[in-house]
């Protein structure tokens, strides 16, 4: 049995905590105002109607309704909108 650790092994063993990013409410789901729809780094998704964006680029609902994802515009950007009933 070795009494010395292998070279380099003592410098391993660290990793950052996962940030739980991604889509939290999918297309067609009902949401209430203030609900978080997407957590993201940067603007992978852009806010559409009845949707706001936080300082950390979190997309959230400004009104009650159903989530709708769409791609539009000359740059084919992804937009999140809330369709109110």
Curated annotation (Swiss-Prot):
Protein's recorded name: Large ribosomal subunit protein bL27
Q: Which organism is it from?
A: Pseudoalteromonas translucida (strain TAC 125)
InterPro entries named among the record's database cross-references: Ribosomal_bL27, Ribosomal_bL27_CS
Q: Example GO molecular function term? A: structural constituent of ribosome
Outline the segment boundaries, as ranges, of region: Disordered: 1-22
In terms of Pfam families, this protein maps to: Ribosomal_L27
Gene that encodes it? rpmA
Any GO BP: translation
Q: What family is this protein classified in?
A: Belongs to the bacterial ribosomal protein bL27 family.
